[in-house]
UniProtKB/Swiss-Prot annotation:
Residues 1-133 form the DAGKc domain. Its cofactor is Mg(2+); Ca(2+). Signal peptide: none annotated. This is Probable lipid kinase YegS-like. It holds the Pfam family DAGK_cat.
C-alpha cells in the first residue's frame, strides 16, 4: 500500500488535545505521512489551503467545528478552478458539528482520522451567497438573531426543539422581518420569522431543519416560517413537524437559487458565521468540491437509491 499524505489543519483552540496528538503519532507509525498546521486566526486558513495545493497535498483534514469547515470551503473556492480538486475531510471538534453529524462522521478521533486517510471522496454541492460560500446552512431572522446575540446557555436551551423556538419567539416579543423572497417558483412578499436555506439536513446544534436534504442533488432545501399570532401556535407546531409543501405558516420547498430583498438588514448567518444583509442571492454550485465521507453516508443521492426512497 502506498504511503498516504494528508495534512491536518487544526483549530488552534484544539492544539493541546492529547488524543489528537496520540492518534497522529499512531498513524505515522503505521507509515502514513501526516503534516499538522495549527491556526491562530481565521486568515490562516486561506494560507494553509494555498500552501497545501502548492505542496501537492491531495487531501486536507479540517480539525474544528462548522466554522472551521466554512473557512476551508471559502479558502478553497478562492483558488483557481483547477485546484478545487483538493479533497477535504473533517475531524469534528466543534460544539455543534452539524455538517459532520448529519453525514454520519464519528467524533471519535482515531477512527475519524482513519476515515480521512482511507475513505473515498465524493463530489458535493456548496451554496454561494453573494461573494461568500457555505457548506451546511444559512439561517435568517429570529434564528440568526439568537445565534448572534444570545449566550451559550440560551443557545443550548433552544436546542430543545420547535416548542422552545416558537415559545421564545413570542416570549421575547420578536418582531418579524418584512421583505421579499424570490425563487424560480415566484416571489413571496410578507413577514418572515425564520428562514433556513439548507444544503445539509441539520443546523443550529442538532435541529433537523431539512431532513430530506441531500448534499449532491443540486438543490437547496428551504424552510420559511411566516408571522403568526399566539392563537396560531398549535397550527405552527403541527406544520413544523409535518414538513409539508403546502401550509399556512411553515413552508418547505426546494430550489436551485433564491434571492432575498429586505428594507433593513436581516440577521443572517452562514454556517453559524454572522453576515447581516439587506440583499443576497443564494445559488447552488453542483458538485463543486470533493469531500471525504463514510460508506453509506445518508446525505448522498445514492443513499436514497439504495433505500428505495
Amino acid at each position: 500500500m502506498p504511503l498516504t499524505h494528508i495534512r491536518l489543519l487544526l483549530n488552534g483552540k484544539k492544539a493541546t488535545n492529547v488524543d489528537i496528538r496520540q492518534s497522529v503519532i499512531a498513524l505515522r507509525e503505521q507509515g502514513h505521512t501526516i503534516d499538522v498546521r495549527v491556526s491562530w486566526e481565521s486568515a490562516d486558513m486561506l494560507r494553509f489551503i494555498t500552501e497545501a495545493i502548492a505542496d501537492n497535498v491531495g487531501r486536507v483534514v479540517i480539525g474544528g467545528g462548522d466554522g472551521s469547515l466554512n473557512e476551508a470551503v471559502n479558502a478553497l473556492m478562492q483558488q483557481p478552478q483547477q485546484d478545487h480538486k483538493l479533497e477535504i475531510a473533517v475531524l469534528p471538534l466543534g460544539t455543534a458539528n452539524d455538517f459532520a453529524t448529519a453525514c454520519g462522521i464519528s467524533n471519535i478521533i482515531q477512527s475519524t482520522l482513519e476515515l480521512a486517510i482511507h475513505g473515498d471522496s465524493y463530489p458535493i454541492d456548496i451554496i454561494r451567497a453573494n461573494n461568500n460560500y457555505f457548506i451546511n446552512a444559512a439561517v435568517a431572522g429570529f434564528g440568526a438573531q439568537v445565534t448572534a446575540e444570545t449566550p451559550t446557555e440560551l443557545k443550548d436551551f433552544l436546542g430543545g426543539g420547535a416548542y422552545t423556538l416558537v415559545g421564545l419567539a413570542k416570549a421575547l416579543g420578536f418582531k418579524p422581518y418584512q421583505g421579499s423572497i424570490t425563487t424560480d417558483k415566484g416571489t413571496f412578499n410578507g413577514d418572515i420569522v425564520v428562514g433556513a436555506i439548507c444544503n445539509n439536513k441539520q443546523a443550529g446544534g442538532g435541529q433537523m431543519l431539512a431532513p430530506n436534504a441531500l448534499i449532491d442533488d443540486g438543490l437547496m432545501d428551504i424552510t420559511l416560517l411566516k408571522s403568526f399570532s399566539t392563537f396560531d401556535i398549535p397550527v405552527v407546531l403541527d406544520e413544523i413537524q409535518a414538513m409539508s409543501h403546502e401550509a399556512k405558516f411553515c413552508y418547505h420547498f426546494q430550489t436551485r437559487w433564491l434571492e432575498i430583498d429586505f428594507p433593513i438588514k436581516l440577521p443572517l448567518n452562514l454556517d453559524g458565521e454572522p453576515y447581516p444583509t439587506k440583499k443576497m442571492r443564494f445559488e447552488v454550485l453542483p458538485k463543486a468540491i470533493q469531500f471525504v465521507l463514510p460508506p453509506n453516508c445518508p446525505c448522498l443521492v445514492q443513499s436514497t437509491q439504495k433505500s428505495g426512497i
